Regions:
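N-terminal Sec-pathway targeting helices
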Residues: 2-15
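Beta-strand-rich domain onsets/edges
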Residues: 25-59, 175, 184, 188, ...
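Extracellular beta-sheet/turn segments enriched in Thr/Pro/Gly and aliphatic residues
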Residues: 30-40, 133-170
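Short consensus segments that form the blades of beta-propeller domains
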Residues: 38-40, 75-78, 105-109
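A short, solvent-exposed loop/turn motif at the edges and junctions
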Residues: 104-135
């Protein structure tokens, strides 16, 4: 068999497998984005967890959770969000996120598929990476949150105001690298987070509220998101 004929045979074999997987509609169809120059297709499974006080073990309401499914950026760094959702716990401390997808996109980051940040006034902020199930790769179609059904404890904050700013700085704008299109698509969850952080401004010294203090940047981002059309 000549090299040209062999090359054609390889291409037609790949296309035949691709066609079969696409017609099957199964999760295995994401194998194709490893073999061909095409985007993967992703879905996020629904999940829930309960937030409690780390000392009293009582459920915590009004905990803001921001979940981001982060794409792989350049040089294997973190990129923008494929999906971003937010939720607030009720009196029972339960936070629930719905399923989403299918959505096409580049490779998702393991551990950030999703990454969830938690914010509640008077408590230390918390970042929850996703302990991916065994066998999960960057191209696995259905992404499940490894902490589904768990109880998450938040520690009361008893530090000084400067330390509270440090806590807020870790979660105030989410973790994904956003562009203008991301701001348009996911305006509400990010704006909800920024507004909750902005509400904490009176608890810190004035130097954090004026330029170039932390809350000056928070205000600029809040105005930018408020002015972004959906």
């Amino acid at each position: 068999m000549s090299w040209l004929r062999h090359k054609r045979w390889i291409v037609w074999s790949v296309l035949a497998v691709a066609g079969g997987l696409l017609l099957s509609g199964t999760a295995e169809a994401n194998v194709l984005c490893r073999l061909l120059p095409m985007r993967c297709t992703y879905e996020g499974a629904a999940f829930r967890f309960t937030v409690v006080d780390a000392e009293t073990r009582q459920p915590l309401g009004e905990v803001h959770a921001l979940a981001e499914w982060q794409l792989m950026g350049m040089y294997s760094g973190h990129g923008g969000p494929l999906m971003a959702l937010d939720a607030v716990s009720g009196p029972d401390g339960q936070i629930t996120f719905p399923a989403w997808g299918p959505i096409p996109g580049p490779h998702l980051m393991l551990g950030s598929d999703p990454v969830v940040t938690l914010l509640k006034s008077g408590y230390k902020t918390l970042r929850l990476a996703n302990p991916s199930p065994p066998g999960t790769t960057e191209t696995t179609r259905v992404r499940r949150f490894g902490r589904d059904g768990q109880t998450i404890a938040l520690e009361p904050f008893r530090g000084i105001p400067d330390e509270w700013v440090e806590q807020l700085d870790q979660v105030w704008a989410g973790l994904a690298m956003r562009n203008q299109d991301d701001n348009r698509k996911f305006r509400d969850p990010y704006l909800n987070r920024v507004r909750r952080v902005w509400a904490e401004r009176d608890k810190v010294p004035e130097r954090h509220r004026v330029r170039p203090g932390f809350f000056w940047f928070v205000e600029q981002e809040m105005k930018r998101l408020e002015g972004t059309p959906k």
